[in-house]
Amino acid sequence: MARVKKAMNARKKHKKILKLAKGFRGSRSKLYRPANTFVMKALKNAYIGRKLKKRDFRKLWIQRINAAARMNGISYSRLMNGLKLSGVEVNRKMLSEMAIQDPEGFAKLAEVAKAKLA
C-alpha cells in the first residue's frame, strides 16, 4: 500500500474549508470539492462587496445632502462649491449626518455657501 505523505496537511486544509462553508446548503457544506468552490466564490464576492459598500455609502450621503440642500434653496453642486470657496472643510459623511440630526446647523452652512457664491 502506498504511503500517505500529506495526510495532516490535507486534513487541516479540508477542515478549514469545511468550517468556512458552514451554513451553506447541501453538498456545499459537506463535501470538500463543492465546498472549496463555493467558499472561494464567497470570499471573492465578500472582497467585491467591501469595495461596493464604499461607493454605495458615498451615493447615499450625496443624495441626503442634495435633498437637504434643495430644502434650503440651493443645489448640491452649488452647495459644495460654495463651502469649498468659503474654506469650510466638512466631509460628505458629516454633512449628511448634519442634514438629518441638526437641520438648523446645515441651514447655516447652506447660507454660508450661498453668501460666498453671491
UniProtKB/Swiss-Prot annotation:
GO MF annotations in UniProt: rRNA binding; structural constituent of ribosome
Keywords: Ribonucleoprotein, Ribosomal protein, RNA-binding, rRNA-binding
A cellular component term, taken from the record's GO annotations: ribosome
Superkingdom of the source species: Bacteria
GO biological process: ribosomal large subunit assembly; translation
Pfam families the record matches: Ribosomal_L20 (PF00453)
Alphabetical list of InterPro entries matching this protein: Ribosomal_bL20 (IPR005813), RIBOSOMAL_L20_CS (IPR049946), Ribosomal_protein_bL20_C (IPR035566)
Family indicated by similarity: Belongs to the bacterial ribosomal protein bL20 family.
Function: Binds directly to 23S ribosomal RNA and is necessary for the in vitro assembly process of the 50S ribosomal subunit. It is not involved in the protein synthesizing functions of that subunit.
HAMAP family: Ribosomal_bL20 (MF_00382)
Protein name in the entry: Large ribosomal subunit protein bL20
Gene designation per UniProt: rplT
